[in-house]
Design a protein with these regions (language model features):
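A short, N-terminal "cap"/entry segment at the start of jelly-roll beta-barrel domains
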Residues: 1-52, 132
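Ligand-binding loop in jelly-roll beta-barrel domains
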Residues: 105-129
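Conserved short histidine dyad/triad with adjacent acidic residue
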Residues: 39, 56-70
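Short acidic-glycine-tyrosine-enriched beta hairpin
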Residues: 90-105
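Structural motif
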Residues: 76, 83-85, 92, 108, ...
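A cytosolic small-molecule/anion-sensing beta-strand core signal
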Residues: 80-81, 96-97, 115
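Histidine-centered metal-chelating micro-motifs
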Residues: 65-66, 85, 101, 105-110
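Short, conserved beta-strand element in jelly-roll/cupin
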Residues: 59-60, 70-86
C-alpha cells in the first residue's frame, strides 16, 4: 500500500531497484509545473498522477500534429481551447472547446490542430513513459 504524503513526491523502486515517482504533489499550480516538448509545435505539462491515473495538459500550435499512435492505456481527452481534427479507429471528427473523446486501449488515434489550443488528457493507468526517471 502506498502511503500518501501531502505536497511531496512519493518514491518507490521499480523492478531494477531504481527509484521512480509514484504520485504527484497534492496541489498542482500551473506556473510551478514544467512544460516539455512533445513533438513539433506540441508541448505537455504533467498535471497530476498516481499509479492508476494521470492528467496531462497538451498545448498545440496551429498546424501541429499529434501523430497517429497506439498505447495500452485508456484515454479520455477534453478540448479546453482551439479546434482539432481528431481521428480514432478510422473515424474523424472536428472538435472544439467543451468537446471530448474517448480512446480505448490499443486504438489508433491522433489529432491535427486546426486552431491553436489545449487538450486535457487523462490516462489510466498512468503513462510511466512520460515520467522522467
Amino acid at each position: 500500500m502506498i502511503k500518501f504524503v501531502p505536497d511531496s513526491d512519493e518514491r518507490q523502486s521499480d523492478k531494477s531497484g531504481k527509484a521512480m515517482k509514484t504520485r504527484s504533489k497534492t496541489f498542482l499550480i500551473e506556473n510551478e509545473l514544467p512544460w516539455e516538448p512533445a513533438g513539433e509545435g506540441v508541448r505537455r505539462q504533467i498535471m497530476g498522477y498516481d499509479g492508476q491515473v494521470m492528467m496531462v495538459k497538451v498545448r498545440f500550435e496551429k498546424g501541429a500534429v499529434g501523430t497517429p499512435h497506439t498505447h495500452y492505456h485508456t484515454q479520455v481527452s477534453y478540448v479546453v481551447s482551439g479546434l482539432f481534427e481528431v481521428s480514432s479507429n478510422g473515424e474523424i471528427r472536428t472538435l472544439g472547446p467543451g468537446d471530448g473523446f474517448y480512446v480505448e486501449p490499443d486504438a489508433t488515434h491522433g489529432v491535427v490542430c486546426l486552431e491553436a489550443g489545449t487538450l486535457l488528457d487523462v490516462f489510466t493507468p498512468l503513462r510511466d513513459d512520460f515520467l522522467k526517471k
